[in-house]
Amino acid sequence: MGAYKYMQKLWRKKQSNVMRFLLRVRCWQYRQLSSLHRAPRPTRPDKARRLGYKAKQGYVIYRIRVRRGGRKRPVPKGATYGKPVHHGVNQIKFARSLQSVAEERAGRHCGGLRVLNSYWVGEDSTYKFFEVILIDTFHKAIRRNPDTQWITKAVHKHREMRGLTSAGKKSRGLGKGHKFHLTIGGSRRAAWKRRNTLQLHRYR
């Protein structure tokens, strides 16, 4: 086995003494830094490479800190102005994952870069920490490489805002296997519409 395979096995055992100590120290270190900062290199090179990262020019890693917990509805003094069924303010759950929120914040901050993917690097009782892989699409090393030319096209601008990254697709219910049967047909809305539309064919 190569070195990355051993690293992958280490990260799978997060309750081991080594990983518990490492994650605890790293979380303390990340808390001292700003909520969004550039990392000199990926904390998990094996995971980053599996998600498309290469240690060459044009690739950037940003580390994001996202606050854990539910979402409070932003209304003045709890006045939602509606039916009682929609009066909820405190126990609201956000539709997307914290990982997709981290990708969005990185994409907003680095508007000239494209978000490729992201991965988890740690968490404590208050925060979750993610590292986001971004690509400089105007760098010659990216534009001239056939494997990365696809992300330089304009259609991939701010893909993290439109749920096109891996974390975003997961929140939209898109994927393969029995867990994603609610989105057969492209999206939840399309699947619901097809199942709830009565079609009376002429010859039936």
Curated annotation (Swiss-Prot):
Organism: Megalobrama amblycephala
Disulfide bonds: none
Keyword line: Cytoplasm, Ribonucleoprotein, Ribosomal protein
InterPro entries (UniProt xref): Rbsml_eL15_core_dom_sf, Ribosomal_eL15, Ribosomal_eL15_CS, Ribosomal_uL23/eL15/eS24_sf
Any Pfam family matching the protein: Ribosomal_L15e
Any Gene Ontology CC annotation: cytosolic large ribosomal subunit
Family: Belongs to the eukaryotic ribosomal protein eL15 family.
Localization per record: Cytoplasm
Protein name, UniProt field: Large ribosomal subunit protein eL15
Main subcellular location of this protein, as a coarse class: cytoplasm
Quaternary state and interactors: Component of the large ribosomal subunit.
GO biological process: cytoplasmic translation
Role summary: Component of the large ribosomal subunit. The ribosome is a large ribonucleoprotein complex responsible for the synthesis of proteins in the cell.
Gene3D superfamilies attached to this UniProt entry: Ribosomal protein l15e (3.40.1120.10)
GO MF annotation, one: structural constituent of ribosome
